[in-house]
Regions:
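Ser/Thr-rich, low-complexity intrinsically disordered terminal regions
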Residues: 1-124
Length: 124
């Protein structure tokens, strides 16, 4: 399911931190809005576990879609991250499934975002 963390930074600092990290890693940004950033990463390797649970993605690419939402005030922002698998991305047969397994939505990515945003956020 969703992972969440409270960050001592404002939403704009969090948005900038997500965008900077994605750019550094070469992760495509699908949406960049004031209170939400959506990242997409193409799954290039075979993944039998995803095939077994969600069916094959044989009419288009399979992607992980990472949605990070954030809302709050200058030094208190709640960040919520959800991860989805998208079969046949960008086709008429596109299917989106929420991933609930913790290995697909690791908490350490949110902890890294928290550290980066708080170091830039100017809050004590």
């Amino acid at each position: 399911g969703a992972q969440s963390v409270n960050v001592r930074a404002d939403p704009e600092t969090i948005r900038q931190s997500i965008v900077a990290s994605a750019t550094e890693r070469g992760t495509p940004i699908a949406q960049n809005q004031p209170n939400m950033v959506v990242l997409e990463r193409t799954v290039t390797e075979a993944n039998p576990a995803l095939d077994a649970e969600f069916g094959p993605s044989d009419n288009g690419e399979r992607k992980f879609r990472i949605r990070v939402r954030f809302q709050g005030t200058r030094c208190d922002t709640l960040v919520v991250q959800d991860v989805f698998v998208v079969n046949n991305a960008g086709t008429g047969l596109e299917q989106v499934f929420a991933l609930t397994q913790p290995q697909y939505n690791p908490r350490q990515s949110l902890i890294g975002l928290k550290a980066k945003a708080e170091s830039a956020g100017g809050c004590a």
